[in-house]
């Protein structure tokens, strides 16, 4: 029986983040959406225009008997730039900022220790925010499993 837990990460464009995590052994499901803002049921347009305060996130449901929260955090750190505020690559805006949203005190502690450890390897200061999870609003259907639907788009991680 699966020991299902949830993790939520903001690490730039949620399409790429979802594609990364959905291939990981122990991940049960992924869903992209919005978290951390002040508008109920925001649209992609509202988020992109900076009108909602939300972050693009990937919600990861995983079996903690197969993969740990620490393992997921390692993937998080290694697959985006946590030192650049409000930007990942070509994507610019608050919605692309680096965030870890936690559900339990245990997740918060693990995330904080992970950030401290990661900072030792970085020349620049990590700007990743670690915040208590708030309401998750699923993104529109066309954003879900985006790269899987566009099977001619392949990402290399």
Curated annotation (Swiss-Prot):
Gene Ontology molecular function: L-methionine:thioredoxin-disulfide S-oxidoreductase activity; peptide-methionine (S)-S-oxide reductase activity
Disulfide bonds: none
Keyword Oxidoreductase included in the entry's annotation: yes
Pfam families for this protein: PMSR
GO biological process, one term: protein modification process
Keywords, ordered alphabetically: Oxidoreductase
Domain of life: Archaea
Enzyme class label: oxidoreductase
InterPro entries membership: Met_Sox_Rdtase_MsrA_dom, Met_Sox_Rdtase_MsrA_sf
Active site as annotated: 13
Record field: catalytic activity: L-methionyl-[protein] + [thioredoxin]-disulfide + H2O = L-methionyl-(S)-S-oxide-[protein] + [thioredoxin]-dithiol; [thioredoxin]-disulfide + L-methionine + H2O = L-methionine (S)-S-oxide + [thioredoxin]-dithiol
E.C. code: 1.8.4.11
Family: Belongs to the MsrA Met sulfoxide reductase family.
Record-linked HAMAP family: MsrA (MF_01401)
Function: Has an important function as a repair enzyme for proteins that have been inactivated by oxidation. Catalyzes the reversible oxidation-reduction of methionine sulfoxide in proteins to methionine.
UniProt name for this protein: Peptide methionine sulfoxide reductase MsrA
